[in-house]
Structures are given as structure tokens and as C-alpha cells.
From Swiss-Prot:
The gene is mrpE. It comes from Bacillus subtilis (strain 168). It is found in: Cell membrane. This is Na(+)/H(+) antiporter subunit E. PANTHER family: NA(+)/H(+) ANTIPORTER SUBUNIT E1, NA(+)_H(+) ANTIPORTER SUBUNIT E1. The keyword Magnesium does not apply. One of its GO terms (biological process) is sodium ion transmembrane transport. Pfam families: MNHE. Keywords: Antiport, Cell membrane, Hydrogen ion transport, Ion transport, Membrane, Sodium, Sodium transport, Transmembrane, Transmembrane helix, Transport. Forms a heterooligomeric complex that consists of seven subunits: MrpA, MrpB, MrpC, MrpD, MrpE, MrpF and MrpG.
Length: 158
């Protein structure tokens, strides 16, 4: 992926200087043309076209922002209500992620979401122990994490 991005930037600079338009518009035009040429010659690269991975990263960011907003609203409702009606709990989340950076990313996304905190990871790196501030159903929480964060991380890494 990094090689394709650097090659695309190199092609953009070549286009910008060969077309005698050293400006941001010339660079962007060269970048788009370079991206198209890399797309057409993608079968010569060992990895998939980098734009798909970039789209997956952007999708993961939007999922995190959405979950962050929803969790903030939920925590705000709990904190501002006159009667503190929460059900804190700890549940075990069995992850399908295998690489260390994937598990770290999942742990960070869960911890950065208000109301949840990854307390520990099992020695075999397959189970995350998560504390939730207000949890009604552990199975629903596991399903939500698996369908949002874990699925998006798998799209980025594979």
C-alpha cells in the first residue's frame, strides 16, 4: 500500500512539472491521473489497489465517530438523569482478530468510547474483558462490537 501511494505521489509530481503547472490544481490532477493509471495496472502489483484500503480506513473512522456520538449521548443521559439508573457489568468478548495491532486497535476503540473500558486481555489474546457502565444484555453488546468495530478492523487489515 505504501509503495502504491508513493508511486502515485511521484506520478503526480511528474505530471505537475511536465505539464508546466506547478500548482495545487496541477498536483491534484496528476494525483487523479496517477491513481487511474495505478488502477489500470493494478494486476502488476502484489497487493490490492490501495484506494480500497483507504476507503476501509475512512469507513472505520466514520463508524468510530458514530459510535462515539451515540455513547456520549447515552452517558450524558445517564449522568444528567435525576436518578442514577445504571447497571454496570463486566463481560468477556471473544475476538476473531489475530494480529497484535488489530487487537490493540479494537481495545483502543472500545476504551475511547464513553461508558466502556477494556480491563484485560487473556494470555492467548482471544478474549477481551470489558467493563460497561450500563449494560442490559451482554450478548447484544458483544454483537454490536463485533458488527461495528471488529468487522471494520478486519476490512482494513485484510
Amino acid at each position: 500500500m505504501a509503495f502504491q501511494i508513493l508511486l502515485n505521489v511521484f506520478l503526480a509530481f511528474c505530471w505537475m512539472f511536465l505539464s508546466n503547472s506547478p500548482s495545487a490544481a496541477g498536483f491534484i490532477t496528476g494525483y487523479i491521473l496517477g491513481m487511474l493509471s495505478l488502477f489500470f495496472f493494478r494486476r502488476f502489483f502484489t497487493r490490492q489497489f490501495y484506494l480500497w484500503k483507504l476507503i476501509s480506513i475512512i469507513k472505520l473512522c466514520f463508524i468510530f465517530i458514530k459510535e462515539l456520538y451515540l455513547a456520549n449521548v447515552s452517558v450524558m443521559k445517564s449522568v444528567l438523569s435525576p436518578k442514577l439508573n445504571i447497571r454496570p457489568g463486566i463481560f468477556a468478548f471473544k475476538t476473531e482478530l489475530t494480529k497484535d495491532w488489530e487487537i490493540t486497535m479494537l481495545s483502543l476503540l472500545i476504551t475511547l468510547t464513553p461508558g466502556t473500558l477494556v480491563m484485560d486481555i487473556s494470555d492467548d489474546r482471544t478474549i477481551l474483558y470489558i467493563h460497561a457502565m450500563d449494560i442490559e444484555d451482554a450478548e447484544k453488546a458483544i454483537f454490536d462490537i463485533r458488527e461495528s468495530f471488529e468487522k471494520a478492523i478486519q476490512e482494513v487489515s485484510r
